[in-house]
Amino acid sequence: RGVVLFCGPYDPTRMDFDSPYGGFMRTVIWSYLGTRDPADPRVADMSLLPHLTSAFPPTFISVGNADPLAPQSYALAEALEAKGVEVDTLFFPPRHEPQLGHEYQLLLSTRDGRLSFERFVAFLAAHSAAPAPAEADAGWRAVRRSPA
């Protein structure tokens, strides 16, 4: 049992809606609430942080160092750790090169994308009820061998 989270908006009340990424986030809240107004009181209901308890499942969180949502992941990891929840993170230093943007985890042709996938698979293996079938392991070995 566990949760895997990649670069999400976990607390919209802490977002800078006037930033270059703010227009996109206004569209996100509009898709859920029918309004683009971040002052709408329902935006606070979208925040995960006030609802965290020590019963939250073990969590793997990863975000790129150039992702506009990176502060959301850092705050969530910190809040989970404060509740005593097992948290495994893959965060990169601010000066890491290449800069890793939103959803870098999907770029398996890159070294950092593969590292994220490897850590993701290891987390799932450690928190799943059953081992992965042999054919899944063989496919993973092929991905790990692909060139950078």
Q: Each PLM stretch: what is its role?
A:
Residues 1-148:
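Alpha/beta-hydrolase superfamily serine-hydrolase fold, recognizing
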